[in-house]
A protein has these predicted regions:
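Conserved micro-motifs of the catalytic ATP-binding
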Residues: 2-5, 72
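A residue-level detector for a conserved hydrophobic packing site
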Residues: 10-14
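Short beta-strand/loop element within the Bergerat-fold HATPase_c
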Residues: 32-44
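Acidic ATP/Mg2+-coordinating residue in the GHKL
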Residues: 52
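Glycine-rich ATP-binding loops of the HATPase_c
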Residues: 94-108
């Protein structure tokens, strides 16, 4: 997938999401730690999914993760602006959409729970999908 424009900012969004997964892995003990990055192109959209198996985001806070200065981490670990800035970059500057949901999925016949961040851009080139 080629996404043109704002490469550094887009990379920062990916890093912010990966850092949150890493921080959650450090808070809990996991035998196996997974982060999956999947991409899909449809006639209308370019979809990027980033999911982990760090247990997901608590129901009480999942709707707040993109708010400025919201954090569940100790002050020395997070400022609460990483995901807020990620949303600003994706939605205001790159004209896409970013969301998060908790998801249960299978991998190698094992069940895992984690957060799944979806980044969706319009497919302006209308690439044909077979």
């Amino acid at each position: 997938i080629n996404i043109f424009g704002m490469e550094n900012e887009f990379l920062q969004v990916i890093i912010n999401i990966l850092n949150n997964s890493k921080d959650e892995f450090e808070r809990k003990e996991f035998e196996k730690k997974y982060i999956f990055i999947d991409t899909k192109i449809t006639q209308d959209e370019i979809i990027i999914s980033i999911k982990d198996n760090a247990g997901g985001i608590e129901k009480e806070v999942i709707n707040r993760v993109f708010e400025p200065y919201f954090t569940t981490k100790f002050k020395s670990k997070g400022t609460g602006i990483g995901l807020y800035m990620s949303k600003e970059i994706i939605e205001k500057h790159m004209k896409g959409n970013i969301s998060v949901k908790n998801e249960n999925y299978l991998y190698k016949e094992n069940s895992y729970d984690g957060a799944n961040f979806l980044i969706i851009f319009p497919n302006k080139q209308k690439i044909k999908v077979n």
